[in-house]
Amino acid sequence: MAQWIIQQKWSDVLFVSFEVDYDLLRSELPKDLEVDTFNGKAYLSIVPFVMSDIRFFFTPPLPFSKLSELNLRTYVRYKNKPGIYFFTLDSDHRLGNFLAQKIFNLPYRYAILDINIDNNLYNVQSNNSLSLEVRIKDKKIKTDLSNWITERYCLYNIIDEKVS
């Protein structure tokens, strides 16, 4: 089994997932990545959450490693291995963004993010791209689709025109 690189704790997570046109999504992906589908349908997800206790495999949790994040992702395959492809990654942590851009070439950008949860009302505000308010009936919904979306342990990126 491969060594993990980064460990992190997620809290206040919300997955807002919706079907998208396969051909439209395919046209927005790097050529070497395949659109992964669930029951023949392609999906995008908007995922706001709070990340904390970030650490590399050789370090304790890093100081000042709590941040809010908002990402737009889709689900892909590379050489038949399922993974995630990020279109955008917004975070309110300038140093974290800089390091993620430089070390992992991820498309992080700085945003002023506000994530609030009051009972079943989830409110997300981003100065870059989004104002979202969702009322949730059941906070823990497990379906075949939610398992397909969340049980992915690989992210793909393009560096120097190669999949990494």
Q: Would you name each region that the model predicts?
A:
Residues 1-57:
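Hydrophobic, proline/glycine-rich low-complexity stretches
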Residues 45, 52-54, 63, 101-104, ...:
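Short, charged/polar low-complexity linear motifs in solvent-exposed/disordered segments
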Residues 38-42, 51-94:
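A glycine-rich, hydrophobic loop/mini-helix early in the fold
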Residues 13, 71-164:
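Internal, well-folded beta-alpha domain core
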